[in-house]
């Protein structure tokens, strides 16, 4: 497990405005908890605590949305 920005397809973060949204997203994916990290390196994005290793996370590089 690890603490990280949870990622969507193409290495894109989940944008957020509310902690509740991120906490629900993170816990649904097996994390202990989550919150909205404001003004972080990837903008306002969901940060998860103790996210399982099989869940994709934001890695180095750009978001490749089509």
From Swiss-Prot:
The lineage of its organism: Eukaryota, Metazoa, Ecdysozoa, Arthropoda, Chelicerata. Alpha toxins bind voltage-independently at site-3 of sodium channels (Nav) and inhibit the inactivation of the activated channels, thereby blocking neuronal transmission. Transmembrane segments: none annotated. Belongs to the long (4 C-C) scorpion toxin superfamily. Sodium channel inhibitor family. Alpha subfamily. GO terms for cellular component: extracellular region. GO terms for biological process: defense response. Expressed by the venom gland. It comes from the Eukaryota. Has the structural arrangement of an alpha-helix connected to antiparallel beta-sheets by disulfide bonds (CS-alpha/beta). The keyword Nucleotide-binding does not apply. One of its GO terms (molecular function) is toxin activity. Disulfide bonds join 12-63, 16-36, 22-46, 26-48. This is Toxin Boma6b. Keywords: Disulfide bond, Ion channel impairing toxin, Neurotoxin, Secreted, Toxin, Voltage-gated sodium channel impairing toxin. It comes from Buthus occitanus mardochei. Its main location: secreted. The keyword Secreted applies. Residues 2-64 form the LCN-type CS-alpha/beta domain. It is found in: Secreted.
